[in-house]
């Protein structure tokens, strides 16, 4: 029968990070500074790497808030309020996304059952790429309720879109309200039809700022957002600061039960004709994970693009699971 594990009561001030590569370590560093947690456990297939990161990050504690940070194993993480999974291989030059999927699904098949057999009761936050497929994989392998298995989704892409629009318009990017939805990847959709700046429709605001060539600007900005990860990887081999900030933001919404609307990856049932596929839609995020998805208004073209994105993800999931 194997080991019998007793369900553990959650410690709302504890977080676990599985995978101590660039993204995992940077996320752990961001979470240490966030003040959200008083305990953090790091896990990596390479124990020494986890120990080294725990030591290095711990040495910054005197400049932050008191906290316990250590390397551990699966038994150490079962009372964590949130388990952040960043483990996985990175895409190598010349490698297709499908190659990467198969490699990382294999890695998840060794990680997720360890969490599932301990009857974990917290929130599983999947960050490894391709995040939509791996969130779907985590759903299927863990048997956990759908609301408690979340992917980081297009939270970072949406931040990139807000940043680009803020620069374009010369306004604070926090005043820009616009979402990237669908796949976190090449088939992502910028939901232009519902975009606004502090309640003023985007096109109207653009004209107020002297921009009249909307189609060209939208195409250029969407391409910048879509290609920015490739560009960063070409220049410095990996992206990790932006995604670490996204992880911190999602954890904040969960721990503080903020009911924030964030475009995280979750299972979609029937919205816009999309069924049984994990992709990003704005959702209310709080202590129970995804409380509900929020159907933003999409024009006909955006709906078609979303259905196409869903189809791509569905086919990829079928090939690997």
Features from the language model and the residues they span:
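Conserved N-terminal Rossmann-fold NAD(P) cofactor-binding segment
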Residues: 39, 43-81, 95, 314-319
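Rossmann-like NAD(P)(H) cofactor-binding subdomain of soluble oxidoreductases
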Residues: 96-162
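N-terminal Rossmann-fold NAD(P) dinucleotide-binding loop
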Residues: 24-25
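C-terminal substrate-binding/catalytic lobe of Rossmann-fold NAD(P)-dependent dehydrogenases
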Residues: 142-148, 157-321
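Rossmann-like NAD(P)-binding element
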Residues: 62-123
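Glycine-rich Rossmann-fold phosphate-binding loop(s) that bind the pyrophosphate
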Residues: 20-21
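Short, small-residue-biased leader/transition segments that mark boundaries at the very start
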Residues: 1-5
């Amino acid at each position: 029968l194997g080991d019998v594990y007793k369900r553990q009561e959650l410690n709302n001030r504890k977080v676990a990070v599985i995978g101590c590569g660039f993204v995992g370590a940077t996320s752990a560093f961001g979470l240490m500074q966030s003040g959200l947690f008083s305990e953090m456990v790091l896990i990596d297939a390479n124990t020494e790497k986890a120990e080294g990161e725990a030591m290095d990050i711990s040495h910054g504690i005197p400049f932050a808030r008191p906290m316990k940070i250590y390397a551990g194993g699966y038994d150490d993480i079962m009372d964590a309020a949130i388990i952040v999974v960043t483990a996985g291989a990175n895409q190598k030059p010349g490698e297709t996304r499908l190659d990467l999927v198969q490699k990382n699904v294999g890695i998840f098949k060794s990680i997720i059952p360890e969490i599932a057999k301990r009857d974990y009761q917290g929130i599983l936050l999947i960050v490894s790429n391709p995040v939509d497929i791996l969130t779907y994989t985590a759903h299927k392998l863990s048997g956990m309720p759908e609301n408690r298995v979340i992917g980081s989704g297009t939270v970072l892409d949406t931040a990139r879109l807000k940043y680009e629009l803020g620069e374009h318009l010369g306004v604070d990017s926090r005043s820009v309200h616009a979402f990237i939805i669908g796949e976190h990847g090449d088939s992502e959709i910028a939901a232009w039809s519902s975009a606004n700046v502090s309640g003023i429709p985007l096109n109207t605001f653009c004209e107020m700022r002297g921009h009249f060539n909307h189609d060209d600007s939208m195409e250029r900005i969407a391409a910048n957002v879509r290609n920015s990860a490739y560009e960063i990887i070409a220049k410095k081999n990996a992206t990790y600061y932006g995604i670490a900030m996204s992880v911190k933001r999602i954890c904040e919404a969960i721990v503080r039960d903020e009911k924030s609307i964030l475009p995280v990856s979750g299972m979609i049932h029937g919205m816009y004709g999309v069924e049984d596929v994990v992709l990003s839609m704005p959702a209310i995020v709080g202590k129970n994970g995804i409380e509900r998805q929020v159907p933003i208004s999409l024009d006909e073209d955006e709906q078609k693009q979303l259905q196409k994105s869903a189809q791509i993800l569905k086919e990829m999931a079928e090939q690997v699971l």
